[in-house]
């Protein structure tokens, strides 16, 4: 079981994060500063991956990544309105709040690793589906490569039958690059 992250560790991380990265939406900075100013709220804050699966989750992104600037999830509703989410945070201080931060080199950051918690709300079969997707992609890549190789071999045979040295050399080069 993972050791709970202390309020001070979370605050230190947010300070570090705000000093090193610029969020795409200024309201995100306001939300993080508001959370830091209330220890009771910080106790309910959890930094996780895939916050869209959480009962109450926020996704915030910095300028250095391509992900969406801001999203707030509550139950089955999603909004990009930061003011609505801020209002919800103030009214529901007793509820857990799961925050996903998208920033460059997030997974190489010891500061982030120190506060990142396992997301208890990720569906159990999600990773199974991801594994299946990876295997399917590998099978597809293998099938395409096999098809291309067989096609080139047929074309090489035809070039040899025609005694077309130029086509043979071109096709043989393509075959060697494929391997």
UniProtKB/Swiss-Prot annotation:
InterPro entries: IDEAL_dom (IPR014957), UPF0302 (IPR011188), UPF0302_N (IPR014963), UPF0302_N_sf (IPR038091), Virus_scaffolding_prot_C (IPR027393)
Protein name (database record): UPF0302 protein BLi02393/BL02764
Organism field: Bacillus licheniformis (strain ATCC 14580 / DSM 13 / JCM 2505 / CCUG 7422 / NBRC 12200 / NCIMB 9375 / NCTC 10341 / NRRL NRS-1264 / Gibson 46)
Highest rank taxon of the organism: Bacteria
HAMAP family, alphabetized: UPF0302
Gene3D superfamilies named in the record: Uncharacterised family UPF0302, N-terminal domain (3.40.1530.30), Virus Scaffolding Protein, Chain A (4.10.810.10)
Pfam families listed in its UniProt record: IDEAL, UPF0302
Similarity annotation: Belongs to the UPF0302 family.
């Amino acid at each position: 079981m993972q050791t709970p992250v202390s309020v001070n560790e979370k605050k230190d991380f947010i300070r570090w994060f705000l000093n090193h990265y610029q969020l795409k939406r200024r309201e995100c900075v306001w939300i993080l500063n508001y959370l830091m100013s209330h220890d009771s709220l910080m106790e309910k804050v959890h930094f996780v991956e895939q916050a869209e699966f959480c009962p109450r989750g926020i996704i915030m992104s910095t300028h250095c990544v391509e992900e969406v600037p801001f999203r707030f999830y509550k139950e089955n509703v999603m909004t990009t309105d930061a003011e609505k989410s801020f209002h919800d945070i103030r009214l529901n201080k007793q509820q857990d709040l799961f925050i996903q931060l998208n920033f460059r080199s997030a997974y190489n950051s010891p500061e982030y690793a120190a506060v990142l918690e396992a997301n208890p709300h990720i569906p159990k079969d999600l990773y199974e589906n991801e594994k299946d997707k990876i295997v399917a992609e590998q099978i597809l890549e293998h099938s395409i490569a096999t098809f291309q190789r067989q096609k080139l071999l047929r074309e090489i045979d035809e070039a040899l039958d025609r005694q077309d040295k130029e086509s043979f050399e071109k096709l043989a080069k393509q075959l060697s690059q494929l391997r």
